[in-house]
């Protein structure tokens, strides 16, 4: 979703929310939570409050009037009834006969509610320095996570990684071959953003930064002499991330055309720009997702920017055999998250041995 549209949607949801949700929104914006995350959470709150009113658990006539005491006194059975409602209600997709929503969606809903309840019962302060209330019913609600071994996850994901020579082959494909498959009109559009697109893909493959971190990069955050980028990690922590040397020519090529191509002025501090109605704007996450999907599908298989992050992590572990180094590169506090890459690399080594 385009940033302007996203912010418009957020304002629409804020206009119907209770005051304490607006407090929550302001607090999380300062962390900072991404606008995308806050938008998804506001959608979940709307669905939850509508259910409270429809189920007569709140006497409010509208969402904005659902009071704190309603949330404070909800029982574990009430929350379980809401989960059952999610599981069994007709799908909102007109073309689907499936009932309910996926477990992933339910988990996202519960995550949003858990975040709100934690804020109301632990983080916020009233005029006496105390939370609004203390009873957190969400701590009693169990979530069901998708069960999948690391080996199974590694098997599913490795086909969507550009390992070995495929990393450079993918960049070369976008640089030299992709446009030959396009119409003349499509070629013009491709050439307009070619340097930028290659710079984005190269940076993701060479650093493993998250999509949101790439979107939020400013010019001051990129040091091509040191091959470092400064990013804001989850939780609002700033971090310096090393970038592999192969990305440098692509980043330099983009910077050489950035000002003239996108009509960038001094106030346009975003590193990656897009032109909208002739004006420079920070590129948004959905545009990068579509761009990466388009190029990767033409090359081999459609992947997301997050798979490019996995690609970097797997290649780095394959070279160093250090989970600590990989976890630092990705911005993880623990090496547990990097266990996946050991399984992928071990599978690749086994496949190589089988070919001897």
From Swiss-Prot:
Principal location listed in the UniProt entry:
cytoplasm
A GO CC annotation recorded here is: cytoplasm
Please state every residue range assigned to the domain named Tyr recombinase.
169-354
Q: Where is the active site?
A: 210, 234, 306, 309, 332, 341 (o-(3'-phospho-dna)-tyrosine intermediate)
Give the keywords, sorted: Cell cycle, Cell division, Chromosome partition, Cytoplasm, DNA integration, DNA recombination, DNA-binding
Q: Could you tell me the Gene Ontology terms of the biological process aspect for this record? A: cell division; chromosome segregation; DNA recombination
Q: Where in the cell is it found?
A: Cytoplasm
- State the family it belongs to: Belongs to the 'phage' integrase family. XerS subfamily.
Role of this protein: Site-specific tyrosine recombinase, which acts by catalyzing the cutting and rejoining of the recombining DNA molecules. Essential to convert dimers of the bacterial chromosome into monomers to permit their segregation at cell division.
HAMAP family assigned to the protein according to its UniProt record, in alphabetical order: Recomb_XerS
Protein's UniProt name: Tyrosine recombinase XerS
Q: Which organism is it from?
A: Streptococcus equi subsp. zooepidemicus (strain H70)
């Amino acid at each position: 979703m385009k940033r302007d549209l996203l912010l418009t949607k957020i304002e629409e949801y804020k206009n119907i929310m209770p005051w304490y949700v607006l407090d929550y929104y302001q607090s999380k914006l300062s962390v900072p939570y991404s606008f995308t995350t806050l938008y998804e959470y506001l959608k979940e709150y709307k669905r939850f409050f509508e259910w409270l009113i429809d189920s007569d658990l709140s006497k409010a006539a509208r969402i904005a009037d659902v009071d704190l005491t309603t949330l404070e006194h909800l029982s574990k059975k009430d929350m379980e009834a809401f989960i059952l409602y999610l599981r069994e209600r007709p799908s909102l997709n007109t073309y689907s006969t499936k009932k309910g929503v996926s477990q992933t969606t339910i988990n996202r809903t519960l995550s949003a509610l858990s975040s709100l309840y934690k804020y109301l019962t632990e983080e916020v302060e009233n005029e006496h320095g105390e939370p609004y209330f203390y009873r957190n019913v969400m701590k009693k609600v169990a979530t069901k996570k998708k069960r999948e071994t690391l080996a199974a996850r590694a098997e599913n994901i490795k086909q969507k990684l550009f390992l070995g020579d495929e990393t450079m082959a993918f960049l070369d494909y976008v640089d030299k071959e992709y446009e030959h498959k396009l119409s003349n009109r499509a070629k013009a559009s491709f050439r307009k953003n070619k340097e930028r697109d290659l710079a984005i893909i190269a940076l993701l493959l060479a650093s493993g930064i998250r999509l949101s971190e790439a979107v939020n990069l400013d010019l001051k955050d990129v040091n091509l002499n040191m091959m470092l980028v400064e990013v804001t990690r989850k939780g609002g922590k700033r971090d310096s991330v090393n970038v592999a040397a192969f990305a440098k020519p692509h980043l330099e090529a983009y910077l050489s055309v950035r000002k003239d191509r996108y009509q960038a002025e001094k106030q346009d501090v975003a590193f990656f720009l897009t032109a909208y109605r002739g004006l420079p704007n920070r590129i948004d996450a959905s545009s990068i997702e579509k761009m990466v999907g388009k190029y990767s599908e033409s090359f081999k298989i459609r992947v997301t920017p997050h798979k490019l992050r996995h690609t970097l992590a797997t290649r780095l572990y394959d070279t160093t055999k250090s989970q600590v180094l990989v976890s630092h590169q990705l911005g993880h506090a623990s090496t547990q998250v990097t266990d996946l890459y050991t399984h992928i690399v071990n599978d690749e080594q086994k496949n190589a041995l089988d070919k001897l």
